[in-house]
Amino acid sequence: MSTQRLRNEDYHDYSSTDVSPEESPSEGLGSFSPGSYQRLGENSSMTWFQTLIHLLKGNIGTGLLGLPLAVKNAGLLLGPLSLLVIGIVAVHCMGILVKCAHHLCRRLNKPFLDYGDTVMYGLECSPSTWIRNHSHWGRRIVDFFLVVTQLGFCCVYFVFLADNFKQVIEAANGTTTNCNNNETVILTPTMDSRLYMLTFLPFLVLLSFIRNLRILSIFSLLANISMFVSLIMIYQFIVQRIPDPSHLPLVAPWKTYPLFFGTAIFAFEGIGVVLPLENKMKDSQKFPLILYLGMAIITVLYISLGSLGYLQFGADIKGSITLNLPNCWLYQSVKLLYSIGIFFTYALQFYVAAEIIIPAIVSRVPERFELVVDLSARTAMVCVTCVLAVLIPRLDLVISLVGSVSSSALALIIPPLLEVTTYYGEGISPLTITKDALISILGFVGFVVGTYESLWELIQPSHSDSSTNSTSAFI
């Protein structure tokens, strides 16, 4: 993020921010008052609408279409209630992160802080001398989890794009205009899905060259529109002629609940884009309202799609609800529209990881080589995500494992602990400490359960073909 500019003063042009420190308000940081929350380059900051678009795009698309199966694993009653609780807790943790960042900015006279810096400075407020002396590890840990999570999402997107386009093309000869019957068709074999991934590679590389969030908001808007249209088509189908739900269990067997929990935590992990968006917003005081509005929309979407999808297809629900739709061109287009949305989402997910890794690389080269090194590093990172998608068998489970570890840590474990360390020296109520401890324990349970389930699936060769990449658990 732009905070990296403060760490690497000799590196002038890498950031997505259009305004350099020399172009910032003439008062500089010396006029930064404790009661205000200013930022450099305010004239080039995003509007509230652009911020909302980015927030929706950063959350919708990750695990959304797998939520009906998640509700099945929890039960018709317990599933939606659990999604609501997890959504509330996740949004609360996002609010904690923003609150702590604001508080530390006022205390330290900083214009803005990213996630890693917020944790680092929060640990410096700890009553423990050992923690204060090792506070820099807080930033390193957060940056590591952010990079793993965001690049993991990017790997999944490669597989998602390849699998969906491959399915549409291979079923083209058998696809009809009759959407009343869900008929099984014989697929016409085409090239391997890995070749589809390589086909998308140059286009995603070009997309990753966009380093300005205001420009990315245009692509986010396109992604939101395409996903919005595809979701309307899905809703239009699943609300028709809903079967009698009396045979569906209100509470599923407890042995399948861990599968629900891991999927839900994965779906609600959007905390990585919160501070980057808040730091770029022109009027940051309005960000909490945008955050709660956007996450309320997302939570309602998650609960409704998960519940209605399970009600419509019952025990036959598949890993992606699109696999249950009729084989006609109308619903085949859902895959294409959603794939377009995922394509543009790649840029936003990639942005977070790039702004952590690239500044450290570019700051070590002469100024005349900065742009070349920047673009080369972006190209290499995109190629790495593509190579991982091509080479790693059962990529869905590998990403599930990474997501369970990173998402639980970033979304549920770290923010409550950050609140305790940040406010401990100023007096924090026992009730708040208890609340934060319970949330962190919940996140740790998600970490343990998600990791266990992913590892268990990875060592079970009979569950599916280990040589086939799949995103069925996520799309």
Swiss-Prot record:
Pfam families per record: Aa_trans
Residues carrying a glycan: 173, 182, 469
Disordered, as annotated region: 1-32
Keyword Acyltransferase: no
Membrane topology note: Multi-pass membrane protein
Membrane-spanning residues: 51-71, 78-98, 141-161, 190-210, 215-235, 257-277, 289-309, 342-362, 372-392, 397-417, 439-459
Cysteine disulfide links: 179-328
Extracellular side: 72-77, 162-189, 236-256, 310-341, 393-396, 460-475
GO terms, biological process: alanine transport; amino acid import across plasma membrane; glycine transport; L-alanine transport; neutral amino acid transport; proline transmembrane transport; proline transport; proton transmembrane transport
Tissue-specific expression: Widely expressed and predominantly expressed in brain. Within the brain, expression restricted to neurons and not detected in glial cells. Abundant in regions rich in neurons using glutamate and GABA such as Purkinje cells in the cerebellum and pyramidal cells in the hippocampus.
GO cellular component, one term: plasma membrane
Keyword set, alphabetical order: Amino-acid transport, Cell membrane, Disulfide bond, Glycoprotein, Lysosome, Membrane, Symport, Transmembrane, Transmembrane helix, Transport
Main location per the UniProt record: membrane
Subcellular location: Cell membrane; Apical cell membrane; Lysosome membrane
Cytoplasmic side, ranges: 1-50, 99-140, 211-214, 278-288, 363-371, 418-438
Keyword 4Fe-4S: no
Catalyzed reactions: glycine(in) + H(+)(in) = glycine(out) + H(+)(out); L-proline(out) + H(+)(out) = L-proline(in) + H(+)(in); D-proline(out) + H(+)(out) = D-proline(in) + H(+)(in); L-alanine(in) + H(+)(in) = L-alanine(out) + H(+)(out)
Record's compositionally biased regions (Basic and acidic residues): 1-15
GO molecular function: ABC-type taurine transporter transporter activity; active monoatomic ion transmembrane transporter activity; alanine transmembrane transporter activity; amino acid:proton symporter activity; glycine transmembrane transporter activity; L-alanine transmembrane transporter activity; L-proline transmembrane transporter activity; neutral L-amino acid transmembrane transporter activity
Family: Belongs to the amino acid/polyamine transporter 2 family.
Its job: Electrogenic proton/amino acid symporter with selectivity for small apolar L-amino acids, their D-enantiomers and selected amino acid derivatives such as 4-aminobutanoate/GABA. May be involved in the efflux from the lysosomal compartment of neutral amino acids resulting from proteolysis. May play a role in specifying sites for exocytosis in neurons.
Protein name, entry field: Proton-coupled amino acid transporter 1
Gene name of this polypeptide: Slc36a1
